[in-house]
Amino acid sequence: MNFTPTHTPVCRKRTVVSKRGVAVSGPTKRRGMADSLESTPLPSPEDRLAKLHPSKELLEYYQKKMAECEAENEDLLKKLELYKEACEGQHKLECDLQQREEEIAELQKALSDMQVCLFQEREHVLRLYSENDRLRIRELEDKKKIQNLLALVGTDAGEVTYFCKEPPHKVTILQKTIQAVGECEQSESSAFKADPKISKRRPSRERKESSEHYQRDIQTLILQVEALQAQLGEQTKLSREQIEGLIEDRRIHLEEIQVQHQRNQNKIKELTKNLHHTQELLYESTKDFLQLRSENQNKEKSWMLEKDNLMSKIKQYRVQCKKKEDKIGKVLPVMHESHHAQSEYIKSLKDKLVQEKKLSNMYQEQCISLEEELARIREEEGMRREIFKDRTNKMGKRLQIMTKRYEALERRRILEVEGFKTDIKVLRQKLKDLEQMLYKATVNARANQDLALLCEVRDSNRRAHKIQGELKNLKSKVFGLENELRLC
């Protein structure tokens, strides 16, 4: 808004001067004007406004300015509503972003819980393996006792002894080392199955040899079982220690995350509260400014109406003055005495003219100061717009980064689940292959069974160490993935 016109129309005044007033000399006029300026004080603003006599051009100019001010006021109100809508959208985006962060934290917590459950399941599997080993050892001991009793007592001619490999409705968990021993015992016990020719009484020499042979087998099996039990105990102890350490680390990490999350939430709440407060203050200040400007415009409109009324009165007074001048021209001799009064009237009119010029200069200065204030307000509004745009851009970038992190976490979780499934399948296949190899070795090599068993035990120990190394590698990979997730 530019209130200072570049070419402002001049206020026209018609001063009625008699023909005799023109004869006054220049120095006397100047002296009279100076005396009048010193003697008469400046009138009040209401008197000045009442004595203004603007022209039609000036009135049209200010009417045009008032229309421009009204249009600009409407534009500013529309822009203010747009800014309000944009701020509301920004608050909605901030709420959505906060919800996304909470969902990501919940997913991370669920992932850590799943890892803890996985460790617990592994420990349970180890316990089941140990229980299975204990039951198989007990089964072997029972079979040996039965065979010893049969060898000592002997069997009748029509008596037949049967050994069942597996009792019905029994659930077992296969293991690589004990399975080999069980198959060896089954192959040995298959010689004592139902056959009327073989199950008869044998000589005492064969019974002694078989008892010695069984004693050696029992000793080797006991040593093997003790070694495997020691390894299994160490492995379970190590896994328990690792699981306890991981659970403790997870608890500490969760506590730190909760504390940090609470701090961030408090900080976000404070910042959003401050932002809402500043936006409300800005909205109220702009609304007050627009209201004040509309009030000023209404006052200017009322002034314009008063000016129109004054102009109409001035026209009437001019008509009356013309009539009086005509009458005075007819009665010149009588008016000669009023020459001094007319000269004083002219001086007063000149004083009024000087005062009106001063008032016009003062009004122009006020308009310039108002324009400077308006420019300053516009600059502040531009700076606020730039700050608002920067904030919206930053919030959009942050939302994109958080969505990308959420998608990456989902992909990692799916890949980890698939990796665990494939590792379990590979280990099961290796276990089946090892069982088949041991079965073939025990079936084909009967001549030199002791050495073959020791070799197979040595190979099985090596493979067990190899599988333990692979399990350690898998654990290290899981720990690496957990560290990456924590860093993310």
From Swiss-Prot:
The modification Phosphoserine is found at S36. There is a cross-link at K51 (Glycyl lysine isopeptide (Lys-Gly) (interchain with G-Cter in SUMO2)). Residues 21-48, 192-213 are annotated as: Disordered. Keywords: Coiled coil, Isopeptide bond, Phosphoprotein, Ubl conjugation. InterPro entries: CCDC77. Residues 55-118, 208-488 form a coiled coil. It comes from the Eukaryota. GO terms for cellular component: centrosome; membrane. PANTHER family: COILED-COIL DOMAIN-CONTAINING PROTEIN 77 (PTHR22091:SF1). This is Coiled-coil domain-containing protein 77. It comes from Homo sapiens. The gene is CCDC77.
